[in-house]
Amino acid sequence: IILSISDYFYLKIMESDRLSEWFVPKFGSRNFRLSIGILFLPYTGMVVSFAIWGSLSVEYDLNRIVAIGLLYFFAIGIAAHCLDALGSKKKPWGHISHRKIWIVSIISLAISFSIGLHYAFLDSWLLFPIGIIEGFFLFAYNLELFKGKFHNDTSFVISWGILPVFAGAAIQSNTISIETIILSAIAGFASYILIITSRKYKILKQQNANYEMYYKKETMLKIITSTVIIGTVLFFLARYL
């Protein structure tokens, strides 16, 4: 099949445009699809799940499970991903208003920090050190501060996998149990597999690799995220029922 020049450049744009990613809705306006896509909902679902793991590793209260879930949704799902779009050297989402992204990020962080501070001052002081560390990684990793020194797999595993589990336990009982530590290790390992697979996936797409090659990585990403999210639902039902 011989492609015209316009077809060729269209395909090149689609290959580099994040709107063509598997986690972006295929329906709706461009702004709607961008707004949903930039949240990386499957990955956000993972980090929220890890926070729930932490809560379920100790004696828990349903209201606090909801609170820690919302905290991480606003902090990571919205704020971190918006800051990542700002800090990225490339513009995979196209030219988005920096002002709007900063406003959304600040509002989201204000909500998440308000939730965290409420429970930290109430009876969960362990949220203070966890929040400080998470806050550091949120800016250092996503905005690639300090010449990108902290934009690496280790920072991702700590902030995305391990600390959310600790935070989930801390908001419930202000303690870190043996079960919490075990679950944090599992979450850290899952996060490592996710980020390694994600990087390989992006490289293959950027190199215009054969569809079957990067589709395998895409399938792995779907399996990892769905396994964690579905597993969390089953874990919750087992503990709740």
State what each model feature region is.
Residues A80-W93, F136-F150, I196-K202:
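C-terminal ends of transmembrane helices
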Residues V47-V48, I52, G69-G77, L109, ...:
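Alpha-helical transmembrane spans of integral membrane proteins, capturing the lipid-embedded, hydrophobic core
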Residues E15-F23, T44-V58, F74-A80, K100-I107, ...:
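Hydrophobic alpha-helical transmembrane segments
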Residues I1-I2, D7-Y10, M14-L86:
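Topogenic membrane-insertion module of multi-pass membrane proteins
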Residues K100-Q172:
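Intramembrane alpha-helical segments
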Residues I52-L70, F113-P129, P164-L183, F236-L241:
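Helix-coil boundary and interhelical linker segments in multi-pass alpha-helical membrane proteins
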Residues R33-I36, P42-I52, I65, L70, ...:
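Multi-pass membrane catalytic core of lipid/isoprenoid biosynthesis enzymes
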Residues F189-L241:
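C-terminal transmembrane helix-loop-helix hairpin of multi-pass membrane proteins
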